[in-house]
Amino acid sequence: MPFITHIKTFAALGSGVIGSGWVARALAHGLDVIAWDPAPGAEQALRQRVANAWPALEKQGLAAGAAQHRLSFVSSIEECVRDADFIQESAPERLDLKLDLHAKISAAAKPDAIIASSTSGLLPSEFYESSSHPERCVVGHPFNPVYLLPLVEIVGGRHTAPEAIEAAKGIYTELGMRPLHVRKEVPGFIADRLLEALWREALHLVNDGVATTGEIDDAIRFGAGLRWSFMGTFLTYTLAGGDAGMRHFMQQFGPALKLPWTYLPAPELTERLIDEVVDGTAAQVGERSIAELERYRDDTLLAVLEAIGTSKAKHGMTFSE
């Protein structure tokens, strides 16, 4: 069965931080959006989050016809998905909830509409088990803020058709994203596994009194993080090998991998460690509100994305290379 690849109506189930980010991105790309969330006050909270994201999206550039009023909020799953060309679920990370939700979504949706889940920790073969037409079901795992960060990890389950993966890649690309196909179902996918390793080491460094939360963030944002934003890890290390490249780098620094630097297992989250992390991040935040920091984050991300795009174009590269 061919799947819908060019969409006009986007369904969003779940309207928290991730779900609202999807809604804002879809609206900014000129789509009609139908949203559903059973939580009390969900519609008002969703519209406020979209309004908060809109200034950054305006700076980035809106598609023709993009408007916040193209968001509809409905009271049932069936109303949300039955006319949708693409469906994105962003419900809480509970297997029982997602099993029930996707059985209802797939029963009411068009049979050729791709169904995606924003899950970061559950595997698609598990929670799409009760879905009808599971061949069109994928994971589409985004990163916060969804309306600005382009990466989306696409993961198929045991029943997912290759054509569904390709359809999802095309749809996300039309939404201005950089789809990354995760070839195997593994917990945490790709990006979160890398982030989790860094998070574990950071917690150990705080726990052992080596550094404060602010010092660890400085080590990233004034060092490796700057290179990571446009080169990633492997290309950075290729350059570290000089003219001889990655082979020389691995021969020279490979033995260091066996040194007992890494802690690997996570530290126990004692009250003392939690207090140190909370107090440290509170000091970093200072008197600024979360809303102020979100605006700072969005403006800075826009500047970084623009700078990367400009520099890549200068060197004959596209943004997604």
UniProtKB/Swiss-Prot annotation:
Chain intervals for the UniProt region annotation (Important for catalytic activity): 317-321
Alphabetically ordered keywords of this record: Cytoplasm, NAD, Oxidoreductase
Residues noted as binding NAD(+) in the record, renumbered to the chain: G14, S15, G16, V17, I18, G19
Pfam families named in the record: 3HCDH (PF00725), 3HCDH_N (PF02737)
Task performed by this protein: Catalyzes the NAD(+)-dependent oxidation of L-carnitine to 3-dehydrocarnitine. Is specific for L-carnitine and NAD(+) as substrates since D-carnitine, other carnitine analogs such as choline and betaine, and NADP(+) are not substrates. Despite a high similarity to 3-hydroxyacyl-CoA dehydrogenases, cannot dehydrogenate 3-hydroxybutylate and 3-hydroxybutyl-CoA. Is probably involved in a L-carnitine degradation pathway that allows Pseudomonas sp. strain NBRC 13558 to grow on L-carnitine as the sole source of carbon and nitrogen.
Record comment: activity regulation: The enzyme activity is strongly inhibited by Ag(+), Ni(+), Hg(+), and p-chloromercuribenzoate, and partially inhibited by Li(+), Ca(2+), Mn(2+), Co(2+), Cu(2+), and Zn(2+).
Principal location: cytoplasm
EC number, as in UniProt: 1.1.1.108
UniProt key word Signal: no
Localization in the cell: Cytoplasm
Name of the protein in its database record: L-carnitine dehydrogenase
Catalysis: reaction(s): carnitine + NAD(+) = 3-dehydrocarnitine + NADH + H(+)
Molecular functions (GO terms): carnitine 3-dehydrogenase activity; NAD binding; NAD+ binding
Bilayer-crossing regions: none
Self-association state and partner proteins as the record states: Homodimer.
Family label: Belongs to the 3-hydroxyacyl-CoA dehydrogenase family. L-carnitine dehydrogenase subfamily.
Gene3D superfamilies xref list: N-(1-d-carboxylethyl)-l-norvaline Dehydrogenase, domain 2, NAD(P)-binding Rossmann-like Domain
Pathway: Amine and polyamine metabolism; carnitine metabolism
pH dependence text: Optimum pH is 9.5 for the oxidation reaction and 6.5 for the reduction reaction.
GO biological process, one term: carnitine catabolic process
One GO CC annotation: cytoplasm
